[in-house]
Structure formats: structure tokens, C-alpha cells
Amino acid sequence: AELTSCFPVG
């Protein structure tokens, strides 16, 4: 569960 999975903010 990576944050970037929901928040693609680099």
C-alpha cells in the first residue's frame, strides 16, 4: 500500500 498509489505526486 504505497501512498503514491493514490497520490501520484512524484
Swiss-Prot record:
Expressed by the venom gland. Its main location: secreted. Signal peptide: none annotated. One of its GO terms (molecular function) is toxin activity. Keywords: Neurotoxin, Secreted, Toxin. It comes from the Eukaryota. It is found in: Secreted. GO terms for cellular component: extracellular region. Belongs to the neurotoxin 04 (omega-agtx) family. 02 (Tx1) subfamily. This is Toxin Tx1. It comes from Phoneutria pertyi (Brazilian wandering spider).
